[in-house]
Amino acid sequence: MRNTWIKTVLLSACVSLPLWSQAEDIQPEAGSDLLIWTDSSTLDYMKYAAESFNRDFGYDIKFSFRGLAPIDAASRLIQDGGSARVADVAEIEHDLLGRLVVAGGAMENLVSSERILSTFLPNATAAAQYAGSNYGFPVSYATLALFYNKELLPAAPKTFEEIIQFGNGFNDAKANRYALLWDIQNYYESRMFLTLYGAYEFGNQGTDAKDLGIDSPLAQQGMNAMKMLKAANPSNPVDMRNAQVRRGLFGEGKVAAIIDGPWAIQGYDNSGVNYGVVPIPTLKGKQPRTFSTVRLAVVSSYSEYPKASQLFADYLSSEKMLLKRYQMTKSIPPVESLMEKIIVDADEATYAIIAQGFHSDAMPSIPEMGYLWSPMASAITAMWVNDQPVNQALDHAKSIIEEQIAYQE
């Protein structure tokens, strides 16, 4: 009911105006006092954004900030909204958007949905939507890349087959030496192989929970191709679940290449290893498609200042502020025109992640995606460690996921 009332109030201020001009027409509520949640590494940027917002528009909005991880921000909005003070604007990862919307915790984007649809990458616009409506304001994206030791691999790997060949004379499990590491059991990292030949998690671009594609012939073909990489990665995936173990071995020079994301760059810099970063190599001539994670600013449906909150969230997604965020935090904006500017003099890691971003798919944001992770981890373990036939492992995972979805309906 509250959501409907807020939407009516906002729309009354925007009637008959094109969506991009709506934000310019709305004025924040008198005495607006906004609470902003973002992760700790982004707090300095967010404080700058708030000052810039007031300065650019002549507002006198009060702001307070709290460092909160995106997954915790979404959980708090769901659990505490309506019973305790929650953020007016929070930043979350897009795969949590569906749960948040279903729980009634997020307002629609009522000021700039058309601008976002026409400006941002398709992955980002899809990530900002749920059930055909726009909720999120995209502010950055991340995906996986290949980090490699330049002392061990002087030439940047272009194919996984090159890494397999290197591993023939390098691998030594007793000495914890491996040509390649990644978190095998983590579907976020291994999905690039399941989708190698065109398979998908959910149909209709990740929105149809009744069309589960993880056991299709194409998915089976992809996972069989992944098993080739045992020759490069003979590690025990259970032992390598801990990211610090994998990254530590890479930093010690015992691992030639590791699949990781931009969140690991600072640690690799501190390790002193001479490393390079490239997009994910091809396997059997196919370009793997990684998951991308889109960071969204969302407006709480419980905000007492919905106009001010919508305006600030919109400001965070403006090209000016996306570029400033990149300059302050290295967070890559999901806008092609900005990526073209950044890539001209980008460092190696940023270049690789931008390049891989064009071969990535936004994680499905429907709530049913949450039922996929554990069964897929078990399926990957069964086929990789226990050598269970791929079709059996994937069929079993699909049956479990379908049961869980049916139970929730």
Predicted segments with their positions:
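Hinge/lid segment of periplasmic solute-binding proteins
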Residues: 94-143, 161-167, 174, 278, ...
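Extracytoplasmic/periplasmic substrate-binding proteins
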Residues: 39, 49, 224-305
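Extracytoplasmic/periplasmic solute-binding protein
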Residues: 135-139, 144, 164-211, 255
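A structural signal for short loop-to-beta-strand junctions that line the ligand-binding cleft
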Residues: 85-88, 117-150, 179, 287-288, ...
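Extracytoplasmic "Venus flytrap"/periplasmic binding protein-like
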Residues: 52-120, 129, 151-154, 247-249, ...
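Conserved N-terminal structural module of periplasmic/extracytoplasmic solute-binding proteins
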Residues: 11, 21-97, 284, 392, ...
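Long, aromatic- and glycine/proline-rich binding clefts that accommodate carbohydrate-like moieties
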Residues: 128, 278, 327-382, 406-408
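Glycine-centered hinge/linker elements that transmit conformational signals in sensory
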Residues: 167, 208-239
